Regions:
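Juxtamembrane loop-transmembrane helix junctions in multi-pass integral membrane proteins
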Residues: 12-22, 91, 112-116, 168-179
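Hydrophobic alpha-helical membrane-insertion segments
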Residues: 31-44, 122-146
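Terminal transmembrane helical module of multi-pass membrane proteins
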Residues: 145-223
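Intrinsically disordered terminal tails
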Residues: 1-26, 41, 46-53, 58, ...
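Hydrophobic alpha-helical transmembrane segments
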Residues: 25, 29-34, 91-112, 182-192
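Alpha-helical transmembrane segments and their helix-start/interface "positive-inside/aromatic belt" motifs
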Residues: 17-32, 115-127
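Extracellular-facing segments of soluble proteins and assemblies that are Gly/Ser/Thr-biased and enriched
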Residues: 75-140
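Long, glycine/tryptophan/cysteine-rich extracytoplasmic
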Residues: 40-92, 138-175
Length: 245
């Protein structure tokens, strides 16, 4: 017996719904893996080109740390009265790994969601990249507007660009999202695809009217009179018994 045949026996039901349920599981697992792996890659990258640094100063922003030319950039920022980069998002960086693990588990638990609860397992994956962008903008705005009035170089308050090319005083800046951010986006895409497929499965389920937040028929497809009775659908169970009798 081949692997596919073994899977088919483990997951009974109409062929199209069986295949959909397999894809739902694969997409949910892949989504969780992508979201969790994004922790190990930068979410945002920033480059500043100055006369004394023609090759540019580069900083990579991870969820829990900063890498790159952080010290050199802090020295330049000191002249315009900006705080050190390490002072930004300290709380967010402390809880980043815990939050990402929870988010990955939510995507993984989508496997067990019922018709009524499926959307609640999708929304966190959508909200996470948006929250990251909002939090990043907040700190860029805060650092660019809370400049030390006694700084050697006086410049007007500003907000560094999140994406694209910008200018700060005589310096040019370039900002892009990193691989970690795109992995998180891809994680949402896969859990959304799982959600769409799950809707098709749930809509075809004979006991969908009795479905709750968690699916009680995850590994089986309702088809026996006893299963409809347990779902509270006694009339359906009676019809099936009459058809078999």
């Amino acid at each position: 017996m081949g692997v596919l045949e073994k899977i088919e026996r483990l997951i009974p039901g109409p062929m199209i719904q069986r295949n959909r349920r397999i894809l739902v599981a694969l997409f949910a697992i892949l989504s969780a893996a992508l979201i969790l792996s994004s922790y190990f890659f930068p979410y945002w990258k920033f480059t500043l080109v100055a006369p004394q640094y023609p090759q540019g100063l580069r900083v990579q922003v991870y969820l829990s740390r900063l890498k790159g030319d952080v010290s050199e950039l802090d020295i330049l920022n000191h002249y315009i009265g900006m705080k050190k980069l390490e002072e930004a998002a300290q709380f967010e960086r402390k809880i980043a790994l815990f939050g990402l693990v929870v988010l990955s588990l939510i995507s993984l638990f989508f496997l067990f969601s019922g018709r009524k609860g499926a959307i609640f397992f999708v929304l966190p994956s959508l909200a996470f990249p948006l929250i990251f962008i909002g939090d990043l903008f907040f700190w860029l705005y805060k650092f660019g507007h809370e400049l030390d009035p006694n700084a050697p170089i006086k410049i007007a308050p500003f907000t560094p660009k999140i994406l694209g090319e910008g200018v700060v005083a005589q310096f040019k800046t370039y900002a892009t999202f990193g691989l970690g951010f795109y992995l998180a986006i891809l994680g949402f895409v896969f859990v959304f695809l799982a959600f769409v497929l799950r809707l098709g499965v749930c809509n075809a389920c004979p006991v969908k009217e009795k479905c709750s937040v968690l699916c009680q028929n995850l590994w089986k497809w309702p088809g026996k009179p006893e299963e409809f009775e347990r779902a509270g659908m006694k009339e359906k169970a009676l019809i099936l018994r009459q058809q078999k009798g």
